[in-house]
């Protein structure tokens, strides 16, 4: 097993253990506990590549969760599942919904930028450099926002912004 996969499994197991502890010791209303349990189960299924099961759990968590901040993370994870499935338009919808509830979610901004960049690359392959530039400019704007929120992250994006003259 590759070391990175071992680390991911370790992190997933650690998250599950911590989530179970939180469910037991943190005072929450029964509905909040249920929502958190569905979220935890969704993350577990997602980490195992069980995307349909993950979505079912996330949708159930969304039905129960009322806190906008917590909902933003559920929406973000739904976006991740759609990204993993290659459903970029759906993923963008969920990233935008997550950002509406939590505008300082740099990972949603980063993933939105990645999809825009990917679409720019596709436009280049299709021989449409003008459309590619529009997508790349959008990617740059999302990356700048993500970098502003998390300056030490997204080094590759920072390099791309500098190389393409969009870092300013």
UniProtKB/Swiss-Prot annotation:
InterPro entries: PSI_Ycf3_assembly (IPR022818), TPR-like_helical_dom_sf (IPR011990), TPR_rpt (IPR019734), Ycf3/AcsC/BcsC/TPR_MFPF (IPR051685). It is a peripheral membrane protein. NCBIfam families: PRK02603.1 (NF002725). Its main location: plastid. It comes from Gnetum parvifolium. Gene3D superfamilies: Tetratricopeptide repeat domain. HAMAP family: Ycf3. This is Photosystem I assembly protein Ycf3. TPR repeats lie at residues 35-68, 72-105, 120-153. It is found in: Plastid, Chloroplast thylakoid membrane. Essential for the assembly of the photosystem I (PSI) complex. May act as a chaperone-like factor to guide the assembly of the PSI subunits.
